[in-house]
Regions:
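Short, charge-dense linear interaction motifs
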Residues: 1-243
Length: 243
């Protein structure tokens, strides 16, 4: 009786082991009937928004006189911008910043003896945001002509943006998805198999770089603002079942 029970237990164990092994083999086979590919979507585009910043600066021994001078210069800048087609709604002026400047003092022996107040430096930044990219580009280059009127003015390189990024992203995702499927079909057809439906999909990082530059792609995403002509790209990781 004990032998019969022993053989019965062994028999049941063997059956269970076979069932588990068969399931594992079937699952492994099914998991291999999948192909994963990465598709790329790229598109070149031209920025349609520009943001440009400049700064007016005045040096004065008297703070009140400095405010008067910078107000007069700001008026000339506003007039120049208006004459060149920039509306007041497109310009933002910052608060006037005031900094004390000091000069070194030396004793009769030529040794450093400390510092003393020399003059005030007052500065005011202005920023232009516009959809007329070409016009603002010209102004940013030619505004230095105000120097001949006694205005100390600085100009920074403009930043360029695009107002239809959401539409661009959707277009890139569509292109990347089609590219992924084309790649998968090419691989599968060469292997004599057939491609089924997509099982999983994941997006890569959205990148915007200069169209002609050598910007480096970043793991967290690149967003170039220094170039008017840009290139956008995104990758899509797709997995397809095989028929």
């Amino acid at each position: 009786m004990n032998d019969l029970l022993k053989y019965a237990i062994i028999g049941v164990s063997v059956i269970i082991s076979v069932i588990v092994l068969s399931f594992a083999i079937t699952y492994y086979g099914r998991s291999r009937d999948v192909i994963s590919v990465t598709g790329l979507g790229e598109e070149y585009f031209t920025s349609d928004q520009i943001v440009w910043t400049g700064r007016i600066r005045v040096d004065a021994y008297n703070k009140q006189e400095g405010y008067k001078q910078i107000a007069a210069n700001q008026k000339k800048v506003a007039q120049y911008l208006a004459e060149n087609g920039i509306s007041s709604q497109e310009v933002t002026y910052s608060f006037v910043e005031v900094d004390k400047q000091f000069e070194s003092v030396y004793n009769s022996n030529g040794n450093y003896a400390g510092s003393r107040f020399a003059y005030y430096t007052l500065s005011q930044s202005f920023t232009i945001s516009s959809n007329d990219v070409d016009k603002v580009e010209v102004i940013s280059r030619e505004i230095s002509s105000l120097i001949s009127q006694g205005i100390d003015i600085e100009s920074w390189t403009p930043d360029y943006y695009y107002s239809h990024l959401d539409d661009l992203k959707l277009s890139l995702i569509e292109k990347a998805s089609k590219d992924a499927r084309a790649r998968a079909e090419n691989i599968v057809n060469n292997a004599g198999a057939k491609l089924g439906k997509a099982s999983t999909a994941s997006l890569g990082v959205f990148q915007i770089t200069s169209a002609t530059g050598n910007d480096e792609y970043s793991y967290g995403g690149t967003f170039n603002t220094s170039s008017k002509e840009k290139k956008a790209r995104i990758t899509v990781r797709m997995s397809y079942k095989l028929k």
